[in-house]
């Protein structure tokens, strides 16, 4: 079995402040280590279910967070950013049997995580077909392009609820929930156990039930914090400015939407 893991940090156990996600701050090292251990737990669950190949995308900030020496021999790690439109699922293709998402977080414009955002902090929100979109939605649709089922997600309570609403058969592991600028989190060891067991169960189940069906067409709207950014980005071919802070792009091919996001964002 060949499995893809996309890993972020803002949805791991215990995290509650931007300092904990940024290399410049001393507390980052603790949460970098926890991000790594949650990825390792996902690998262990995958191997228990029969995975022999695991590709991991370090998908937080610089893309250089996961401690490679902790990974099993059957894993390969993508570090840094190539600039490819698949972004957080770079190199994903139809050869994979499943996509797992670890440490994912609530979308911009929601109260489910003090670190809620979508892709970066320059935007107030990103919507597809009129609904605010999370990094989960963006990349689960990418998996849908290649027929790869999205079988597991761990992260905050908000993103797990969103994922279950979009893919009812997905296995979720909610490790924290928000109260304003604070979080209530389970202990890291418990989170790692939930991820390990959840991944094993998800991969052993009927993965076809976790296939993501794509809409027939896509209306992308990106709302920037600064109107100057919207003016500049609206010059992308096919895009237009639909408001002082908003850029709009319409297409029937989701890969073209991902390409637009790559250049507009």
Where are these regions (language model features)?
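Active-site glycine-rich loop that binds ribose-phosphate moieties when present
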Residues: 120-146, 154-159
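Short catalytic helix/loop segments, enriched in acidic residues and glycine
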Residues: 19-44
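Extreme N-terminal starter segment of soluble prokaryotic enzymes
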Residues: 1-4
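Active-site rim beta-loop-alpha module in soluble metabolic enzymes
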Residues: 142-203
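C-terminal accessory domains and tails appended to enzymatic cores
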Residues: 178, 191-265
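N-terminal glycine-rich phosphate/adenylate-binding segment common to multiple enzyme folds
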Residues: 79-122
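Short beta-strand segments
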Residues: 6-7, 57-58, 99-103, 153-154, ...
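Glycine-rich nucleotide/cofactor/substrate-binding loop typically near the N-terminus or early
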Residues: 16, 39-94
């Amino acid at each position: 079995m060949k499995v893809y893991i996309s890993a972020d940090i803002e949805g791991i156990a215990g995290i509650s402040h931007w300092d904990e996600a940024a290399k410049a701050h001393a507390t980052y090292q603790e949460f970098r280590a926890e991000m790594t251990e949650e990825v390792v737990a996902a690998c262990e669950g995958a191997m228990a279910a029969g995975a022999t190949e695991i590709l991991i995308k370090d998908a937080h900030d610089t893309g250089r967070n996961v401690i490679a020496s902790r990974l099993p021999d059957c894993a390969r790690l993508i570090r840094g950013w190539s600039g490819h439109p698949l972004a957080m699922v770079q190199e994903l293709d139809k050869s994979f049997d499943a996509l797992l998402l670890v440490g994912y977080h609530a979308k911009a414009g929601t109260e489910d995580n003090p670190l809620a955002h979508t892709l970066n902090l320059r935007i107030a929100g990103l919507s597809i077909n009129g609904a605010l979109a999370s990094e989960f939605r963006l990349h689960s649709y990418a998996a849908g392009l290649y027929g790869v089922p999205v079988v597991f997600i761990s992260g905050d309570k908000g993103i797990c609820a969103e994922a279950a609403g979009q893919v009812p058969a997905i296995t979720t592991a909610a490790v924290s929930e928000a109260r304003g600028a604070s979080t209530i989190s389970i202990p890291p060891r418990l989170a790692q156990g939930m991820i390990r067991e959840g991944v094993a169960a998800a991969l052993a189940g009927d993965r076809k039930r976790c296939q993501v069906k794509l809409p027939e067409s896509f209306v992308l709207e990106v709302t920037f914090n600064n109107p100057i950014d919207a003016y500049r980005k609206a010059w992308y071919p096919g895009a237009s400015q639909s408001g002082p802070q908003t850029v709009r792009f319409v297409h029937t091919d989701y890969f073209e939407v991902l390409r637009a996001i790559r250049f507009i964002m």
